[in-house]
Structure formats: structure tokens, C-alpha cells
Amino acid sequence: MKNIGRLAVTALIAVFIFSVTGCNMIEKTPEAIAKSTVAEVNGEKITRSDLDKDPNTIQLITQVKQQYGENYKENEDAVNTIKTQKEQILDDLITNKVVAQKAKELKLLPDETKLKSDMETQIAQLKKQNFNDDAEQFNTALKAQGFTEESFKAMFLSQLRTQQTLEKVTESISKNIKITDKEIEDYYNTNKSKYTEQPNKMHLAHILVKTEDEAKKVKKRLDDGEDFAKVAKEVSQDTASKDNGGDLGTVNYDNSGYDADFMAGALALKEGAISAPVKSSFGYHIIKCIKKEEYPVKALSAVKDQIKTQLESDKKNSLVSQKIQEWKKASTITKKEKNII
């Protein structure tokens, strides 16, 4: 059965409260939990239901169930993971609420008729691509994930409204952005390695240890002539590469999959060189640059439009983020974190 965007029903966790007049414990019903307030933004409530029905929460619960099983609520690590992640999701919902309120004030809300039309079009595409236009299969999949067609459409419409509201607000905020030729030239001169005829590459190996002292001892052994691959197999704590002598294969200069500090240390090496200890979020590395492949840089004229688009996007994102933070600071926001789970 197809999974609809990895959606799943969020299990409601029972919450107990003490009455103010005595020690009688009252267990909230699922309906009461769903209606409980998790945050208020300028007087508008965000309910537990809003939080639990958010696709990010649904995906979170699906992943937790896969890792910890159906009885995940009995596992302290699982509960802590859910709480931490739901706090982040709630922050996003608060931001969305602030943006929606400001959009209403600025008359930037999307047209509801168009929204509903877009929703129907996208759901129809979903049915066609994933269920061969079979309504029965589609509804069975919805039911398995805890949705009726009506509740799924309501969730979908809400997400689409948030997306289109942000798009309209972004367009309004960033409409006067200009990128000068000097900005383009400066960016090009600073980032020439991004604009080569082919991606610049380096063949790397590394040895990972926990402490700087361990890394210094490893470096001394290498400086004294010991074989890099042999030492890596002996002491490296990177289980994915140690059996290959620490070999990481070919890595592009702009590879974002590696720790930024690790990449900075690697890029600073000449071919054949071995680094001093490099600290990253994983520990301390001794990095060896086995080989470098560098290619000619494209002319500015060939990449000018590409750079302009990049700078416009960067400026737009920065400006919108700054403006939203201003709106949030000017808002009255309260969170009731005890109601999150």
C-alpha cells in the first residue's frame, strides 16, 4: 500500500491533572487533549490538534514507531525525542501564525477559491501518480494513516495556505531587491572554485579519534614514517572507512555532506599532505589529501546570470527571515509546553 507523504496518525498521550480543590486526578479525554492550547500568538490559539496533525509531527511519530515499536510511549528516549522535536515543530507553527496574521493585515492572504482549486488539482495528481486514479485504493490508504478524505483535504488545504501565504509575503518583502554588477563580480572572485569547467575534486583519507591528544599521537606516528592506512586500520573510530585504511574516496570541493570544519581542513591541504589535528563535530581528524583534480574557472560572463539568481535568492531569504523575526519580537507569544505531549 502506498504511503501518502509518510503520513500516520499521531497517537494521543494521556495527560493527568490535579484539581485545585483536592487530590482527585482527572484524566483528559482525547477530545480535551486535542483542544488543549499549546501556544497563543497575539490571542490566537494553536491547539494540540494543530500540532499533532501537522505533517512533520505525523512523520516524527511514524519514525519513532519504526525505531521503538508501538509501545514507544513507554520508552524514555522515545518520549524525550518526541518532546524535543515537537517543540521545534511548534516554533514553526508559531512562525506560520505570525506570518499569516501579518499577511492578513497587509492584505496578502491567498485567494481561497484558487487555494481550493489548487488543492483539488494536486490531490488529483497524487491519486493518479500513486493510486492509478483508484478512489478505493486512495481512501483505503487514507484510512490506514488515520484520515478520512475530508480530514486529509483539510490538512492539505491548511499546508497549502501556509505555503502560498509565505510566497506572497516573500514576494512583497523582496520586490525591491537589486543585485549590482559589483556584487556579482565580488561573489565570483571570492567563489571561483564553484564555477570550474568540471567540479574540483580531492581524494581523501582520514583517521578519526576522540581527543586532541590522541590525534597528536597519531600525527607523530605518521611523521615518524608509519603507513597511514595501517594506522587508520588500527586506531580510527570511523567504522565506515577504517577497514579501507581511512579511504574516503573522491570528494567534491563543494560537498555539503561533510562537516564544514573537516572540509575546511581538507581544502587547505596540498596534494600528498597530511593535516595537523582537525576538530569537527565528530571528534579529531588527521586528514590526508591523496590527490587533487582542479579545473579551469569559467569566465564571469558565462556564470553571471547564475550568480545573480543565487544572490537574489540569498538576499531574499535573509530579508524575509529578518522581517519575520521582527514580527515575532513585536508579537505576544506564550507557549504551554506541558501540553505538547
From Swiss-Prot:
Localization (cell): Cell membrane
GO biological process: protein folding
EC number in record: 5.2.1.8
Alphabetical list of SUPFAM superfamilies matching this protein: FKBP-like (SSF54534), Triger factor/SurA peptide-binding domain-like (SSF109998)
Lipid tethering residues (N-palmitoyl cysteine): C23
Reactions that this protein is recorded to catalyse: [protein]-peptidylproline (omega=180) = [protein]-peptidylproline (omega=0)
Signal peptide: 1-22
Mode of membrane association: Lipid-anchor
GO cellular component terms attached to this protein's record: plasma membrane
Principal subcellular localisation of the protein: membrane
Lipidated sites in chain (S-diacylglycerol cysteine): C23
Entry's Gene Ontology molecular function annotations: peptidyl-prolyl cis-trans isomerase activity
Keywords: Cell membrane, Isomerase, Lipoprotein, Membrane, Palmitate, Rotamase, Signal
UniProt cross-references to InterPro entries, sorted A to Z: Foldase_PrsA, PPIase_dom_sf, PPIase_PpiC, PPIase_PpiC_CS, PrsA_foldase, Trigger_fact/SurA_dom_sf
Domain (PpiC) ranges: 199-291
Functional description taken from the UniProt entry: Plays a major role in protein secretion by helping the post-translocational extracellular folding of several secreted proteins.
Family assignment from sequence similarity: Belongs to the PrsA family.
Protein name: Foldase protein PrsA
UniProt source species: Clostridium kluyveri (strain ATCC 8527 / DSM 555 / NBRC 12016 / NCIMB 10680 / K1)
Gene symbol of the encoding locus: prsA
